[in-house]
């Protein structure tokens, strides 16, 4: 293999490694254990994945954005409490029960989307109702600032 080919392979590999895909949890208690172990904060997102336009937009434009993903992979444990409405998308009863319990504690008013930044113990640091009115970079910067002030 010549130098040019090797360089191309290495660059492609580095590019692929630089884009991280977030692991989403659907059990808050499990997420708390991981957050404690890894010394991270928890970002809890309430969504209606098949009926809530702003929820879908939030996922596509911010939570799936490379800037957010890079930050979240290093600093956050991500939890999604989804409340789909279409019969074909219904969650198993056990998951619905878990999500209902999370909503009872953190989203009793049923706001969608609702994003909540939590400490590793589940203490609320900040809530965002609806779709953020800022860019992905500004959203990440706000979370960084909240984390810095919490420590």
What are these regions (language model features)?
Residues 38-52:
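Short active-site neighborhood of thiol/selenol oxidoreductases, capturing the structured segment around
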Residues 38-42, 74-79, 111-113, 120-123:
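Loop/turn elements at helix/coil->beta-strand transitions in domains of secreted/extracellular proteins
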Residues 55-71:
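Typically the conserved alpha-helix immediately C-terminal to a functionally engaged Cys/Sec
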Residues 104-105, 109-150:
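Non-catalytic, surface beta->alpha helical segment in thiol-disulfide oxidoreductase systems
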């Amino acid at each position: 293999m010549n130098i040019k080919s090797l360089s191309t392979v290495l660059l492609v590999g580095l590019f692929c490694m630089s884009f991280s895909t977030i692991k989403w949890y659907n059990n808050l208690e499990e997420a708390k254990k991981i957050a404690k172990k890894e010394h991270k904060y928890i970002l809890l997102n309430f969504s209606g994945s098949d009926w809530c336009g702003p929820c879908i937009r939030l996922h596509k434009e911010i939570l799936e954005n490379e800037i957010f993903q890079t930050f979240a992979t290093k600093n956050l444990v991500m939890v999604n409490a989804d409340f789909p409405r279409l019969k074909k998308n219904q969650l198993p009863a056990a998951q619905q029960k878990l999500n209902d319990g999370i909503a009872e504690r953190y989203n009793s008013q049923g706001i969608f989307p609702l994003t909540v930044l939590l400490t590793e113990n589940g203490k609320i640091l900040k809530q965002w109702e609806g779709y953020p009115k800022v860019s992905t970079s500004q959203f990440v910067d706000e979370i960084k600032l909240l984390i810095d002030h919490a420590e």
